[in-house]
Amino acid sequence: MNVQGFQKLTLLDFPGRVGCTVFTGGCNLRCPFCHNAGLVRNPVEGANQEQEVLKFLAGRRGLLDGVCITGGEPLLQPDLEQFIRRVKELGYLVKLDTNGSLPERLEALLKTGLVDYVAMDVKSSPAGYALASGSEIAVSRFERSIRLLPSAGIPYEFRTTAVKGIHTVEDFSEIGRWLAGDSPYFIQTFVASDNLLGSGCEAFSRDETEALLNAVKPYLPAARLRGQA
């Protein structure tokens, strides 16, 4: 698998677990607020760290609980399942981060029983998806993934990074209607950096973010904020 880097310790990426995070190269979206621009546009050929990661994990058994696989978009990797099997053989739980654009691959992976937790990014409301994702992938593909997770039998979450200029309060009302139910949902704070895909992205203020949450809550009672100071 094309592993472009890994973080040896995270207390945040895998809820309730002490883990490490593996970053895969390449993505089929071009979200202007993406903070992993290098992984999306220019993954380094020949820089695969898969064996280094597996060796690291072999030496951390009993110290780490799980591995978060993120990107880029991990489901683009043709040998993702094989990598996960090797991680599971070492005794680790596996969390998958995905943008949900590849529902067939997501469904096939879920059926293997290898994944213990899935976090899916919901980029925006259906009407705002093209702007937020920088792509023309049919919204129906993301919706298929959204419908898969509640019946997968494993913990999961939906999450949206809130970005001023990309999202509005109405977008979040529509997201709430789209996801309506008891699914775990997080509105994440946008953090500016020098490694963004686009420009002009700004964070909402705390009060503005609370307004976004209030727009979602009637439809998603479990909605929460993540990353607010």
Indicate residue ranges for each PLM-predicted region.
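A secondary-structure boundary/capping signal
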Residues: 23, 70-72
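Conserved alpha-helical substructure of the radical SAM core
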Residues: 37-67
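Conserved AdoMet/S-adenosylmethionine-binding subsite of the radical SAM
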Residues: 54-66, 75-207
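Short, charged low-complexity linear segments at domain edges
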Residues: 1-18
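Conserved beta-strand segments of alpha/beta enzyme cores
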Residues: 2, 184, 221-224
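Canonical Radical SAM [4Fe-4S] cluster-binding loop centered on the CxxxCxxC motif
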Residues: 14-48
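A C-terminal junction/extension of Radical SAM enzymes
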Residues: 210-229
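Conserved beta-strand termini and adjacent loop/short-helix elements that scaffold enzyme active sites
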Residues: 6, 188-190, 225-228
